[in-house]
Amino acid sequence: MFEYVTGYVEYVGPEYVVIDHNGIGYQIFTPNPYVFQRSKQEIRVYTYHYVREDIMALYGFKTREERLLFTKLLGVSGIGPKGALAILASGQTGQVVQAIEHEDEKFLVKFPGVGKKTARQMILDLKGKLADVVPDAFVDLFSDTERFDEKKGSSAELDEALEALRALGYAEREVSRVVPELLKESLTTDQYIKKALSLLLNGKR
């Protein structure tokens, strides 16, 4: 129904943002609302209008590719909007695609609500069908196994750090806030934890 919404970020919450467009506030659920910052500059959010008997909601994404992966995930049995958002909340779109293409169940089951059965279903339903989702930086992932193994290693260290944060009592929304910053660097598990704690304690988003 809506391709995108352009406007000003009026509110940022744990689950959604409100975009003000011509005096109308659009409540848009996003994978990580904290990647959007309140400002006087207009932004564009690519949207997906989800309608079912018991729910009608707008879901928003920073790129068309992210939205496309969301819609493909919705087509997998056992994954609903909340589950799809949780998968995308890490900001690791390319690595999710890599995991599916290389049948890496261990990576996929680390997402909230994804068990072994759902991970296998994701691979069965989506493997070989995600080339149009992959950003330019990952155009050769389907043939470059060595690069995948290297990225999977650093991803494992980040995953361990995120699990440690959860074990320390940080809520999922707090963990999601710092993921974009952590993804900018390649660190050891301990270094990821120290940096994440610094970001959380300083309130940086």
UniProtKB/Swiss-Prot annotation:
Region (Domain II): which ranges?
Answer: 63-141
UniProt GO BP = DNA recombination; DNA repair; SOS response
- One GO term of the cellular component aspect? Holliday junction helicase complex
Locate the region Domain I.
1-62
| Region of interest called Domain III, as start-end residue ranges on this chain | 153-205
Chain spans, region Flexible linker: 142-152
Looking up Gene3D superfamilies in the UniProt record yields:
5' to 3' exonuclease, C-terminal subdomain, DNA helicase RuvA subunit, C-terminal domain, Nucleic acid-binding proteins
GO terms assigned for molecular function: ATP binding; four-way junction DNA binding; four-way junction helicase activity
Pfam families listed in its UniProt record: HHH_5, RuvA_C, RuvA_N
> What are the subcellular locations of this protein?
Cytoplasm
Q: Does the keyword DNA repair apply?
A: yes
Looking up HAMAP family in the UniProt record yields:
DNA_HJ_migration_RuvA
Q: Which family does it belong to?
A: Belongs to the RuvA family.
Its biological function? The RuvA-RuvB-RuvC complex processes Holliday junction (HJ) DNA during genetic recombination and DNA repair, while the RuvA-RuvB complex plays an important role in the rescue of blocked DNA replication forks via replication fork reversal (RFR). RuvA specifically binds to HJ cruciform DNA, conferring on it an open structure. The RuvB hexamer acts as an ATP-dependent pump, pulling dsDNA into and through the RuvAB complex. HJ branch migration allows RuvC to scan DNA until it finds its consensus sequence, where it cleaves and resolves the cruciform DNA.
Subunit structure of this chain's protein:
Homotetramer. Forms an RuvA(8)-RuvB(12)-Holliday junction (HJ) complex. HJ DNA is sandwiched between 2 RuvA tetramers; dsDNA enters through RuvA and exits via RuvB. An RuvB hexamer assembles on each DNA strand where it exits the tetramer. Each RuvB hexamer is contacted by two RuvA subunits (via domain III) on 2 adjacent RuvB subunits; this complex drives branch migration. In the full resolvosome a probable DNA-RuvA(4)-RuvB(12)-RuvC(2) complex forms which resolves the HJ.
Q: What is known of its domains?
A: Has three domains with a flexible linker between the domains II and III and assumes an 'L' shape. Domain III is highly mobile and contacts RuvB.
Concerning NCBIfam families, the annotation shows: ruvA
Protein name according to UniProt:
Holliday junction branch migration complex subunit RuvA
Q: List the source organism.
A: Bacillus cereus (strain ATCC 14579 / DSM 31 / CCUG 7414 / JCM 2152 / NBRC 15305 / NCIMB 9373 / NCTC 2599 / NRRL B-3711)
